[in-house]
Swiss-Prot record:
It holds the Pfam family Helicase_C. Residues 395-439 are annotated as: Disordered. GO terms for cellular component: cytosol. Residues 40-219 form the Helicase ATP-binding domain. InterPro entries: DEAD/DEAH_box_helicase_dom, DEAD_box_RNA_helicase, Helicase_ATP-bd, Helicase_C-like, P-loop_NTPase, RNA-helicase_DEAD-box_CS, RNA_helicase_ATP-dep_RhlB, RNA_helicase_DEAD_Q_motif. Keywords: ATP-binding, Cytoplasm, Helicase, Hydrolase, Nucleotide-binding, RNA-binding. This is ATP-dependent RNA helicase RhlB. It catalyses: ATP + H2O = ADP + phosphate + H(+). NCBIfam families: PRK04837.1.
């Protein structure tokens, strides 16, 4: 983590439970990020917060540290039943819930607290076995949690800490009725520690906070900056004919270590995957139609470096905590201005540098003025040399073709890695001999 991303506040200097301090130290957490430095002193006084921070600022660890500390420092409710978790963390997507659970397990190592996760797309029975053994911290999506509550498998009467993550996304996905349903089945707000985090604290999000929290303290981190200064943004105006060739050329020229390509529709994502797969890249596809187990496997492969490119709809734009994403490509400009911010927020995280490349094509160029108004700046325009675009592009593969197990043809991973300018056989010129930009 870059030192410029950290504050001067040390975790060791905060009045945290010894088991929490030990887990933080063992996992390399010494200094707080700004959102952690602002929120933890408030939360450690058992005061509720409504926090606003950009993605990648460490808010997940902020609420996890507060949750673990609160449970370890607070007596267990009298007559607590096995089906009563002590804390509940609600997330809008399965991917975010899974990532939160992974981070929670790091903190749980030295405590007696059990972490459980539930979400749709997986077997009820498998998840129920975990719940039947009792969990202290329940992490999940609202729909699956409600299913278990209605069946009596989960009872929320013993909740002592509540986290609502990505609250604005909850509104976008229509989950607010579910959230209110769950809040009504918990102890009153003054009997629990309540935490809400959101990329934006809109009026509707603040209303939700004040309805179900106990006089929350508002914590904000640089709300005026919707995009990180660590992200280099640029935009091209390709013709529809040039669009795919330009993307393939940019990827070969930039040669990103880890990239996400966003498109607006499932069909477009499948088309992108087919061309990238056909061009020899190690690429995964993440859309709403991909089965849950396959989605998890793809995310793990991407996180572990077995895939270099992830093609995704906006289902993956929020909540994915994947380190070292070097490039984000907006093949289509999103219709929603906030989606632009959340897409490019996948890179430039934790103080690292990132690159965002967007296409303002004939179909979606009309979205650009609203996006630039929303982010309060113009995106620098880059021109490209049409004669320098790739010509010898292999045909796309069919979507049902299984991903090859071998390494990406373009990149050699043995020894010192891919030599500069390495390329496929077939007469393609080295990447550094071709440039996309025009002076």
């Amino acid at each position: 983590m870059s030192q410029t991303h950290l504050s001067n506040q040390k975790f060791a200097d905060l009045p945290l439970h010894p088991e929490v301090k030990q887990a933080l130290a063992e996992n390399g957490f010494e200094f707080c990020t700004p959102i952690q430095a602002l929120s933890l002193p408030v939360l450690l006084q058992s005061k509720d917060i409504a926090g606003q921070a950009q993605t990648g600022t460490g808010k997940t660890m902020a609420f996890l540290v507060a949750t673990f500390n609160h449970l370890l420092s607070t007596p267990v409710p009298e007559n607590r039943q096995l089906n009563q978790p002590r804390a509940i963390i609600m997330a809008p997507t399965r991917e975010l819930a899974i990532q939160i659970a992974k981070d929670a397990i790091l903190l749980a190592k030295h405590s007696h607290l059990k972490v459980g996760i539930v979400y749709g797309g997986e077997s009820y029975d498998v998840q129920r076995k975990t719940l039947d053994q009792g969990v202290d911290i329940l992490i999940g999506t609202t729909g699956r949690i409600i299913d278990y509550v209605r069946q009596g498998i989960i009872n929320l009467g013993g909740i002592q800490a509540v986290v609502l993550d990505e609250a604005d996304r909850m509104f976008d996905l229509g989950f607010i009725k579910d959230i209110r349903f769950l809040f009504r089945r918990m102890p009153s707000a003054d009997q629990r520690l309540n935490m809400l985090f959101s990329a934006t604290l809109s009026m509707k999000v603040q209303e939700l906070a004040y309805d179900h929290m106990n006089e929350p303290v508002k914590v904000e981190i640089a709300p005026e900056e919707k995009t990180s200064k660590n992200i280099k943004e640029e935009i091209f105006y390709p013709s529809q004919e040039d669009k795919m060739r330009l993307l393939l050329t940019l990827i070969e020229e930039d040669w990103p270590e880890k990239a996400i390509v966003f498109s607006n529709t499932k069909h477009s994502c499948e088309n992108l995957w087919s061309w990238l797969e056909g061009d020899g890249h190690r690429v995964g596809l993440l859309t709403g139609d991909v089965p849950q187990k396959k989605r998890i496997r793809i995310l793990e492969q991407f996180t572990q470096g077995q895939l270099d490119i992830l093609v995704a709809t906006d289902v993956a734009a929020r909540g994915l905590h994947i380190s070292d994403v070097s490039h984000v490509y907006n093949y289509d400009l999103p219709d929603d201005c906030e989606d632009y911010v959340h897409r490019i927020g996948r890179t430039g995280r934790a103080g690292n540098k990132g690159v965002s490349v967007s296409f303002a094509c004939e179909e979606y160029a009309l979205n650009l003025p609203a996006i630039e108004t929303y982010i309060n700046h113009s995106i620098p325009v880059s021109n490209y040399d049409r004669d320098a675009l790739l010509e010898d592009i292999p045909p796309p593969v069919k979507i049902h073709r299984r991903h090859p197990a071998g390494a990406r043809n373009l990149r050699e991973r043995s020894g010192a890695g891919r030599p500069q300018g390495a390329h496929r056989s077939g007469g393609r010129p080295p990447r550094h001999d071709r440039t996309r930009r025009q002076p």
